[in-house]
Structure formats: C-alpha cells, structure tokens
Amino acid sequence: MEKFGVHNPATELATVGLGSAASVRYNFSAAALYEESIRRGEAELTAQGALRALTGQHTGRSPRDKFVVRDANTDGEIWWDNNKPLSPEHFALLRADMLAHAAGKDLFVQDLVGGAEEGHALPTRVVTEFAWHSLFIRNLLIRPETAALATFVPKLTIIDLPSFKADPARHGCRTETVIACDLTNGLVLIGGTSYAGEMKKSVFTVLNYLLPAKGVMPMHCSANVGPDGDAAVFFGLSGTGKTTLSADPARTLIGDDEHGWSENGIFNFEGGCYAKTIRLSAEAEPEIYATTQRFGTVLENVVLNEGREPNFDDGSLTENTRCAYPMHFIPNASETGRAGHPKTIIMLTADAFGVMPPIARLTPDQAMYHFLSGYTAKVAGTEKGVVEPEATFSTCFGAPFMPRHPAEYGNLLKDLISRHGVNCWLVNTGWTGGAYGTGKRMPIKATRALLAAALSGELGQVEFRADPNFGFAVPVSVNGVDGGILDPRSTWADKTAYDVQAEKLVSMFIANFAKFEDHVDGGVRDAAPGVKVAAE
C-alpha cells in the first residue's frame, strides 16, 4: 500500500481493516485535493476557482436509510420511535463487505475535530473514496494544526464509499443506500450515496448522542455574538431564516448550523459552513456569495454554463444546491468558534397559516414546549394549485439528527435557560394579514428591527399582552416597527377566518405534543396553546 501525507503511523487504516487499499492520501491540502478530484474526473473547476461536483441520484440526505446499531449500550439510550435499529450482526456483515469493497482502491483520509471546546471535542477520521468528499469534510470540520496530525487518535471513524451498494437481505437495511452508525464503537459506514452532507450530519448525530451524558446541550442552530460578548442562538428549521438572520455585520458569526452549550458557554461543532445556494445573489447575501467566487469552496450540484460560470437560479438538478467553505471565508467569523453563555435565544418559525405574531417572549417552560414542538409550515406545491399550508413539527428543530429522546434535550435546555437567565423569543418570519395565498410574507425589515430590539434588551422593557391562543407575551408596540403587524388578528380583513385558522393551528400543536405529555413536568404541559392566560 502506498501512503502519502502527514499522519500518525500508530493509527493507519490497517487498524480499522482497510489495509488492502491500493493507496492512502492522508490530510491532503485543498490544492492537492483539487488536483486529485479533477485528475480522477470527479469534479470541475469553475471560472472563479471553486470546485463543482455532482452527486448523481442522491441530491439530499436519505433519512429513511439511516440506522443506529441496537446493542446493550444503546438499547435504553436511543429514541427508537425516531431511529431505525440495526442489529450488531447485520452491522458486522456490512462492515466486512464494505472493507472488502475498499480493497485495491485509492482512499483519502482527513483527520479532523468536531467541537471547538477542547474538553468536549470529538477527534474524527473521515475515509473517502472521492477526493472531493475529502475536501468537503476538510472545509466543514475543524482542522488541527499540522504538528498535531502526527499524534492524532480518532474517537470516531467515518468510512464513505458511494460505489458500495448494500444488500437489504444481507445487511438488514432498506435499499442499496445505507448510513449505519455504531455509536458504541465510534464507527459510521456510508454507502450507495454521493451526497456529501451525510458525512457532516453523521458527526452531528454522534455528538448529539455523546454530549448530553456530559451535561452538554447539542443544538441544531446558528449563533453569533455582539461586541459586548452578548451571544445569541438561533433555532429554526429549513427556510425560517436561521442563516440569513444570524449573518449580521454588527455581530461576529460563531457558526451557522451546529453548536454545543457547556458549563463554559457555547461552541461551534464545525469549522465551516454548508450553505444553500439556490437563487443566491451578491445583493441579498454578499458574504455567502463571495465564498462561491474563490478557490477552496466546493459547489455541490450547482449548474455551470459553457463558460463554467455558476448559475445559482438553475434548480434543474435539485433545489438543494449547496456550497461548502471554511469558516474563515466569512469576514466577521469567530476565530475561536466559542462564546460565553447566550444572553438571548431566538426560535424561528415560518408560520404560513398567518396566525402567529412576528415576535413573542417565552418563559423557560414555553421555550421547552416550543423547542420540543419544533414548528414551522411549508406551503403546498404550486403544481397542484393548492394554497393550504402544511404544518411541520421537527422536534428539537432537528429530529433526524437526535438519537436520544427529545425530553432529554428539552430538559437540558430548560435547565440551562433557567440557570443563566436567558431571554427567549419566538420569531415568526412567515405570513401576516392572512395565510399563504392571501396574506403577505412578514417584512424582513420588521423582523430585523424586532430582532435588534430583542438582542439589545430594549424589547424586554416594553408593554406586553398575552396572546389569546398561545398564551405567550406579545409586545404592544416597538420603536421603528409598524404596530399593526404586532397583533396578527388585526392584520386579517376577516377576523372570524383568523379565529378559525388559529383554532386549527392550536389543535395541530396539541395533537403533535401528545407524545411528549408523559415526559415533561406540569409547567411545560401548561405552556401548551389553548391554555388561556390573563391578558394583562
């Protein structure tokens, strides 16, 4: 076997059964991985110097093909209602067959770290058969100093072989695509998909399993910090504005997607960003756009024209086009990936029913209720001409990545909020003046003004009213914001229609939360919508 690059000779690939590979390239730089990717026909150079790769059949994650090994250690720890079990016997067969499949191949290795706080960091080795995958994960995770690579010992190993096709009958999986996580032994096997995001989210899943046992809260969120050290966390599902609203030139970006909250404060799990690029423009998101115009960035499934110029408006391959770049490509990004305890938590929702106010203050119990609910709404497909919104509840604002029961994360969050006196706000970036199809999108200018008032502390000093449907506190007036939009009912021409819509949304919340009723205390149960609170 040929070996290239700096690495620890005591932890070579032979130690995990990959000793039959033709060659291994350890910890290659971006420039070297560009050369390998292009030489091997995996990717193309864009006119601006980014690297464009296509993922073929899979242009997004495959959550139905993700499994967790169910063994003596994980049996009582995993939320099996939400995670698919795989027997140790099936995993052993899958591992043996994948290792055999790797024989004779050229492999790429990156030794990286998940977690910017030293005491809670996860040394992670990622083994790939694609050079561009190696660059992708090098961009996304935290890169150790070169000197540290000679003594690097991984606690998690990910083996990603897209050319391997699983056998459902033999391996206990669903299709030829498989993402199998052995949490006990720190091994993730990925086969049958070229979508690079599977590697990133596998690290997140493992951290979401390990950290709560250490009293550390893992979060699917973005985070930033102000000049006075006032950190803020932004929870929210896709399309709610998490990335856009946390990108604030007046504040330092800690990270855009995954963080932990420990006894020392918050810290990024990653060393890069994986941003959506569909309809990306220099005018709307200049910092993200600039990353797509430089060497080192990976563009995933972005259409190029004949001159190799990216066309970010073209979603013909997928709407889920992405770019992956290291954090330092963003001008105001944190160099440490860490900050103190958050002063503010923002929970974002895009309510397409037009019922929720643009901002509401949450008590710790209400914050846990809305965290466990993880609500947003998607608008129906225009091809069917349907204008009825579809409610989406993804617990902890990231159900696919949460191995443990949501109540574990919820109780941890509630405790941290109470202990550190964090101000919590629910922000609706969805519709006002009616539901989707009748109303209009919440003005981004108003959202930013409300957010600025919340982060500065100004919003805590205004007069509030209790929302008659959800019970949370809603500001009556805020400087610089049209007071009319603060009361959603008043923005509807047909008040009766609003009441009907509100009752419908409340009933959806109650039905969704039923599965958590037995796992929370009375205070959280009383935070449910429909529980009327005195108005003033």
Swiss-Prot record:
Binding site for Mn(2+): K201, H220, D257
Localization, UniProt: Cytoplasm
Residues annotated to bind substrate: R61, Y195, K201, R322
Pfam families from the UniProt entry: PEPCK_ATP
Keywords: ATP-binding, Cytoplasm, Decarboxylase, Gluconeogenesis, Lyase, Manganese, Metal-binding, Nucleotide-binding
Enzyme Commission number(s) of this protein: 4.1.1.49
Primary location: cytoplasm
Catalytic activity entry: oxaloacetate + ATP = phosphoenolpyruvate + ADP + CO2
Family note: Belongs to the phosphoenolpyruvate carboxykinase (ATP) family.
Protein name per its UniProtKB record: Phosphoenolpyruvate carboxykinase (ATP)
